[in-house]
Regions:
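Short cysteine clusters
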Residues: 125
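Rhodanese-like catalytic fold shared by cysteine-dependent sulfurtransferases
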Residues: 1-77, 87-120, 129-171
């Protein structure tokens, strides 16, 4: 306090608890300082409206969640897995219960017309890239993709026996 008087300050007050106690009470340490309210980041939902567990990347499904369902043969009825590969590749092996719609040469509207209605759609391919492309094609064309997702994974199937390695999220 004496130093402040020597510097010319006139209205000097001493807080008995000292600075550590002052800070503990979350009180400002300068006249201009105001407590900053932290802005909460918008919470991303964990599940889709129908109950599919969402991945970290936009449009993705949680890969480990879906992999476990596929391996345990417990993919829910509300989910339709859509293999986007050419029919020739699909016939070599695919995820049990999946259907094949080769999306590469189709427009977004043509893809949607072939998708089952009232289902959560999950696109898959052999490495993730073509399923992402199919999803992006729909999104770019303004299609509602709130229940359409992609499975970002390396998938190698012989008949219905599949080895699945989930790719790391980009986020």
């Amino acid at each position: 306090a004496d130093k402040l008087y020597k510097l010319g300050y006139k209205n000097v007050v001493v807080y008995a608890g000292g600075l550590p106690e002052w800070k503990k009470q979350s009180l400002p340490t300068t006249a201009g300082a105001k407590k900053v309210d932290t802005v909460k980041k918008e919470q991303k939902p964990e599940f889709s409206k129908n109950g599919a567990k969402l991945g970290k990347d936009e449009g993705s499904i949680d890969g480990e969640w879906l992999k476990a369902l596929i391996i345990d043969n417990k993919v829910p009825e509300y989910i339709q897995i859509v293999n986007v590969l050419p029919a020739k590749e699909f016939k070599k092996g695919n995820i049990k219960g999946s259907i094949n719609i080769e999306t590469d040469k189709l427009s977004a509207k043509e893809i949607v017309s072939k998708l089952p209605k009232n289902k959560t759609i999950i696109f898959n391919c052999s490495a993730g890239a073509r399923s992402i492309e199919a999803w992006m094609k729909l999104k770019k064309d303004g299609i509602d993709v709130s229940e359409i997702f992609y499975f970002d994974a390396n998938i190698n199937c012989k008949d219905n026996n599949c080895k699945i390695e989930v790719n790391e999220p980009l986020e």
